[in-house]
């Protein structure tokens, strides 16, 4: 059945499938803004326990406001359909951007830093994602990472086609809330640096992709559980930013040390200009001489 509107939201077009059900691009007819409307799947909406979980999620999301987390606006119901309204984000999923190929290391570190900083704010109020993958990260045209489906891990296997929690053959060491999120950042960072998800025995990113800077290897290894993993997302974010700054300084030093490139065409153009000028002066002199002498 085609859905034309839900409450004050006019449905414009399908936009994909999320952890809860089908997602649509819609317009808020009261204020004119574009939003994302998720129609909650019947198997979730008809389950009293799941409904209660959604209400808890909606209340918890109100405590988190971060530019790298998709904002939830409303959880409503219209004509028996349960729906969720959230910020509409234009961009591509990180999974699509990677496409089986390594990203520029500096870009990968920047995106991972954004994700970790968002998690730091969320974890500070005990709000955990629980199922972060490259599919749940949308990157805007301006390069901002936006975490989607935040707090919906409980539904990730409830709806066919929804993003799951599997991360290759790797698994987080234990199932302790925030630690799962930090482990997932390590998985995503490895995938961005190498073009593929880590598997046991894969080694560090620089061993898979020689263009990946070795300075990032200890961070990825620790995030994936070695040496006890990271205790907080804030610590992970700080270390990522530090490595990013180091790479920036190194690049600036490299650019400053590079000899200036001299264009050989400029002298030729300069000589040609002088020749043309000389010919013009000679012609003018000849004209003046034969005119007045």
Located regions from the model:
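Protein kinase catalytic-loop region centered on the HRD/HxD motif
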Residues: 117-127
């Amino acid at each position: 059945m085609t859905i034309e509107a839900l409450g004050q939201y006019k449905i414009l077009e399908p936009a994909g499938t999320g952890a809860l059900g089908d997602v649509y691009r819609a317009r808020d007819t009261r204020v004119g803004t574009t939003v994302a409307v998720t129609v909650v799947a019947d198997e979730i909406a008809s389950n009293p326990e799941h409904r209660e979980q959604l209400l808890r999620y909606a209340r918890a999301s109100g405590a988190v406001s971060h530019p790298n987390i998709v904002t939830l606006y409303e959880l409503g119901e219209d004509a028996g359909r349960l729906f969720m309204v959230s910020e509409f984000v234009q961009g591509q999923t990180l999974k699509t951007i990677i496409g089986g190929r390594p990203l520029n290391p500096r870009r990968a570190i920047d995106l991972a830093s954004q994700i970790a900083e968002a998690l730091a704010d969320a974890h500070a109020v005990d709000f955990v994602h629980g199922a972060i993958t490259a599919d749940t990260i949308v990157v805007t045209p301006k390069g901002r990472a936006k975490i989607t489906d935040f707090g919906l891990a409980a539904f990730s296997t409830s709806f066919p086609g929804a993003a799951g929690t599997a991360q290759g053959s790797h698994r987080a060491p234990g199932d302790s809330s925030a630690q799962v999120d930090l482990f997932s950042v390590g998985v995503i960072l490895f995938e961005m640096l190498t073009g593929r998800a880590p598997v046991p025995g894969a080694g560090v990113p620089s061993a898979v992709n020689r263009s990946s800077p070795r300075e990032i290897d200890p961070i990825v290894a620790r995030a994936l559980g070695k040496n006890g993993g990271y205790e907080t997302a804030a610590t992970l974010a700080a270390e990522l930013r530090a490595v990013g700054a180091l790479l920036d300084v190194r690049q600036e030093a490299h650019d400053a040390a590079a000899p200036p490139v001299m264009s050989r065409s400029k002298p030729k153009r300069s000589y040609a200009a002088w020749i043309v000028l000389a010919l013009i002066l000679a012609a003018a002199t000849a004209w003046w001489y034969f005119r007045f002498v």
